[in-house]
Amino acid sequence: MPRYTVHVRGEWLAVPCQDGKLSVGWLGREAVRRYMKNKPDNGGFTSVDEVRFLVRRCKGLGLLDNEDLLEVALEDNEFVEVVIEGDVMSPDFIPSQPEGVFLYSKYREPEKYIALDGDSLSTEDLVNLGKGHYKIKLTSIAEKKVQQSREVIDSIIKERTVVYGITTGFGKFARTVIPANKLQELQVNLVRSHSSGVGKPLSPERCRMLLALRINVLAKGYSGISLETLKQVIEVFNASCLSYVPEKGTVGASGDLAPLSHLALGLIGEGKMWSPKSGWADAKYVLEAHGLKPIVLKPKEGLALINGTQMITSLGCEAVERASAIARQADIVAALTLEVLKGTTKAFDTDIHAVRPHRGQIEVAFRFRSLLDSDHHPSEIAESHRFCDRVQDAYTLRCCPQVHGVVNDTIAFVKDIITTELNSATDNPMVFASRGETISGGNFHGEYPAKALDYLAIGVHELAAISERRIERLCNPSLSELPAFLVAEGGLNSGFMIAHCTAAALVSESKALCHPSSVDSLSTSAATEDHVSMGGWAARKALRVIEHVEQVLAIELLAACQGIEFLRPLKTTTPLEKVYDLVRSVVRPWIKDRFMAPDIEAAHRLLLDQKVWEVAAPYIEKYRMEHIPESRPLSPTAFSLESLRKNSATIPESDDL
C-alpha cells in the first residue's frame, strides 16, 4: 500500500493510500482532515471542503495538479507539502527547510562499499563517504570486537556494578548512581539534553562525514555499543538519512558533545532529519520513509554515540584534503604568473634546494621546473626576454619553493595527526574486552586535532598572502609592464582593480582567523571539565581560511590568464598553455569591463574540482620520470658556462673567469 508524508501547517502526517487511482486533490484533503482531527478546535476550520489548497513536492518544490493520479504524479513514500491559500500558518515556503541546505536533485545512491574496521580509514576515504560515493559495511573482525565489548557492558549491568556513564550520571553527576530500571531513560535523557547546539546545520556532506567517522570509531570495539545498534546506525547512513546538526556548540572536550548529540537525536527519531528523497522533515518520518525504525538505546549506547572528537576530526579531514588540493594547484598558478611577469627559473635550480633539503621546498621547486623548463617545454614568452638585464625576481616569485614548500610540509604534518585521530577510540569510559573491564580516561580531549588545525590555518594562509602580492604585481603597470589592472582603455575600464581589493580583503580577514582557538580554554560542567580544546572552532575557521585561499588563487589564476592576452601571439610552455585553455573554457578574456563575480566563482570551481591539477599533473609526472636530477633548466637570466657556449662565439678560458 503506497503511503505519503504530507506537511500541513508545520505538522508532518503519514497518509496511507489504498488505491493508486486516487488523485492528488484527495491526498491534500485527507491530509487536512487528519490535521483537523488532531487539533482540539479542528485547526480553526469548520470543514475540509472550505479549505482551498495547493500541493507540491518537497523535493524541488514543484506544484502538482490536484486532478493528477497519485500513481502517476508521486512515488511511494514521497514527501509533499499542502499550502493552504490565504493562511498565515501555511506560508509559501517549507518552514522546516533550513537556510543554505538544498535537496540533491541529481543524487544517485552509491553501489560501492567501504568496509570499516576502526583502524584503516583515510582522510580521502572519509571525504568520499561525505560526498555519497560509498556505502558502509563492517569487517568481520570489527563485528567480533564490537560484540565482545558489549558483553562487558551487559555483565556490568547484570552485576549492578557502579561504572561511570553506565550506571551513574554524567560530568558533575558522576557520583549519582542510577537505578537499574532507569538506565535506558538515562541514555535518552543524555542525548536530548546535550542536543543544545546553535547555528546553521552542517551540510549533508559534512553530516555524512560526521556519521561515517562515528561509525568507524565505534567499529574499534572500545565503546560498548551493541552490534545490533551499530548496524542500525549503518543502515541510516546507507539510506543517507542525516540528522540536523548545528555547527556551533562544542568546546572540544568532553569530545564534541553537542553536535554528536544532535546526530544521535535523529537516530532515535527525534528532531529533524534530511535525505535526498525527503528534504528536511521530522526524523521519525524520514526514517519511516526509508523503511527504518528509530533506534532504541540500550544502557551506555547514548554515551557511546556522543562522546568523541569526530566533529573536529571530520571537518579536519575536509580541511586537509582541500588544503592539499589548493597547495598543489598554487604552484601551477604561481608558475603561470611568473611567465606573465617574465621571471627567471634560475631560483628553482636543483643545487639551491639540495643545500636546504626540506621536502616541501624540494617538491615545489621541482614542480616549477617541470612546468617552466624551456629545454623540456619551449616557451616563446621565455625566449622573448632571454637576454634581458634582469638578475633576480621579487620574493613573491623567487621564494615560492620556500613559502609554498613549508605549506606542503605543514599539511603533511597535520594529515598525520588527523589520520591517527580518525582511527582512534575517543570514548569515555573505554571498554577493554580483553581485560573484562572499563577504564575512565581522557581520549575525548580534542587538543591534538585542535592544535593541528590551528597550525593548518596559519600555514595554508600564506598561500593567499603571497598570491595577493603577485596579483598586485600583475595589476601594477610599473611592476608588470602590462596595461594597468590588465584591461585595455584604462579609465573607461577598471579591469582587475577591485578583484585585487577582494583578494586583499580575504587575506586580511584570514589573518584574524589564524589566531589559534586552542590557546583558549573555559572551565565547564561545574569545573569537572576544567580544560577544553575549542577544537570545533579551530576546524571551522581552518575551513574558512582554506576557502579564502582558494578564492584568492582563483583571482590570481584569472589575472595571469588575462596577462597572457597582452603577450600574444607568444606562447608559454605546453602545460601552462593547457591551464590557460582550461580557464578559457569557462571564462572568456576581458575586452572591457563586465560582471566579474561569476568569473571568479567559475575559476574557484576549477580549483575546487582540481581541474587545474588534472591538466598539469601528467606533464609534471612525465618530467619526473624523464628529467635528469642534476640538470639545470636554462633561464632567461641564467649565467653559466653552458649558456655562454651556446650563445657566444668567444668563450673565456676557465682560468680567466
Swiss-Prot record:
Transmembrane segments: none annotated. Liver and skin. It is an enzyme of class 4 (lyase). Changing S223A: 2.4% of activity. Changing S508A: 75% of activity. The modification Phosphoserine is found at S635, S648. It comes from the Eukaryota. GO terms for cellular component: cytoplasm. Contains an active site 4-methylidene-imidazol-5-one (MIO), which is formed autocatalytically by cyclization and dehydration of residues Ala-Ser-Gly. It holds the Pfam family Par3_HAL_N_term. Its EC number is 4.3.1.3. The keyword Phosphoprotein applies. The modification Phosphothreonine is found at T396, T637. The modification 2,3-didehydroalanine (Ser) is found at S254. Pathway: Amino-acid degradation; L-histidine degradation into L-glutamate; N-formimidoyl-L-glutamate from L-histidine: step 1/3. This is Histidine ammonia-lyase. The lineage of its organism: Eukaryota, Metazoa, Chordata, Craniata, Vertebrata.
